[in-house]
Amino acid sequence: MKKGSLAPNLKLSLPPPDEVNLSKFLTESGTFKDGDLLVNRDGVRIVSQSEVEAPSVIQPSDNQLCLADFEAVKVIGKGNGGIVRLVQHKWTGQFFALKVIQMNIEESMRKHIAQELRINQSSQCPYVVISYQSFFDNGAISIILEYMDGGSLADFLKKVKTIPERYLAAICKQVLKGLWYLHHEKHIIHRDLKPSNLLINHIGDVKITDFGVSAVLASTSGLANTFVGTYNYMSPERILGGAYGYRSDIWSLGLVLLECATGVFPYSPPQADEGWVNVYELMETIVDQPAPSAPPDQFSPQFCSFISACVQKDQKDRLSANELMRHPFITMYDDLDIDLGSYFTSAGPPLATLTEL
């Protein structure tokens, strides 16, 4: 791959906010509207095609939760788009995560947030973080999410440095079930699978979160071609700007598992003490160099084979989530009673939760 040939039109940092006023997305009643999506202080609703032009107003009675029901406990995450607070329901005492995103941002980012709300509204899976309700008020979107008290897999990895194979298999099995649901039931490519987007809790659950850059396809064989997501975990076909499918998420999963097993990101910079000069250098390495592999002298043949099945350079050669669930690396531990809950809690309190927006 020639220097400078890498997706020349890509913008690797957010452009300054555009001139489109937020009022473009608001109805006369102050409801945030994007196509079939309506969000106001009373909740969120997806309207039918016949209602898009003249949708009815969301009523408070449509939803069981409202922002006034929650009391802020502390800030547990910050990002460019806003903050995440730990909140407690005043009447039940239950804890939730409240993600608050200011909407005075560029139009494309508002579109991403609207897409995230649609996916949150329609997804119901034990391996995907639950979104209970969303609101729009005072220029901000607020999303009530399931609180995962173990933080993210990235937080956990900072504490334990590496994760043994048997625990990785149990973690991976849950992630694969979540990906199977997204890919085959909802036709969604996550497009930003990474350790910080996998959340854990004290009972051993592992759940996928953050659908801000996800794509919804028309079918299980559909393709996308938009360049979004975290560059480190991006598949070669996505970096090259070509069409890609659900197996781009499988590439990302392979890198995540290899990082968890070895304790380091699979692609090392030429000068280890200096890091990558820029993101283009990293992406050119991902495209030009052979795919990373698990050192056979450190890991089982089953794990090495699993990683290889995930990080094939040609997406057609990668196994699907469903196929990977039958891989020996996953099935070899089926008879063992692997207590992820105890393993997660043994490392102590989480460093943070939902640290990226």
Swiss-Prot record:
Family listed: Belongs to the protein kinase superfamily. STE Ser/Thr protein kinase family. MAP kinase kinase subfamily.
List keywords of the entry alphabetically.
ATP-binding, Kinase, Nucleotide-binding, Plant defense, Serine/threonine-protein kinase, Transferase
* Residues annotated as the enzyme's active site: D192 (proton acceptor)
Pfam families under this entry?
Answer: Pkinase
Role this protein plays: Phosphorylates myelin basic protein (MBP) in vitro. May be involved in disease resistance.
Q: What is its EC number?
A: 2.7.12.2
Q: What is this protein called?
A: Mitogen-activated protein kinase kinase SIPKK
**Domain Protein kinase residue range list:** 70-330
Species this protein is from? Nicotiana tabacum
GO cellular component annotations, sorted alphabetically? cytoplasm
- Could you mention a single GO BP entry for this protein? response to other organism
Relate the induction remark in this record. Answer: Induced by tobacco mosaic virus (TMV) infection and wounding.
Subunit-structure text: Interacts with SIPK.
User: One MF term from GO for this chain?
Assistant: MAP kinase kinase activity
The record's PANTHER family line, in alphabetical order, gives: DUAL SPECIFICITY MITOGEN-ACTIVATED PROTEIN KINASE KINASE 5-RELATED, MITOGEN-ACTIVATED PROTEIN KINASE KINASE 2-LIKE
- UniProt keyword Kinase, yes or no: yes
According to its UniProt record, which reaction does this protein catalyse?
A: L-tyrosyl-[protein] + ATP = O-phospho-L-tyrosyl-[protein] + ADP + H(+); L-seryl-[protein] + ATP = O-phospho-L-seryl-[protein] + ADP + H(+); L-threonyl-[protein] + ATP = O-phospho-L-threonyl-[protein] + ADP + H(+)
Gene3D superfamilies recorded: Phosphorylase Kinase, domain 1, Transferase(Phosphotransferase) domain 1
Q: Which gene encodes it?
A: SIPKK
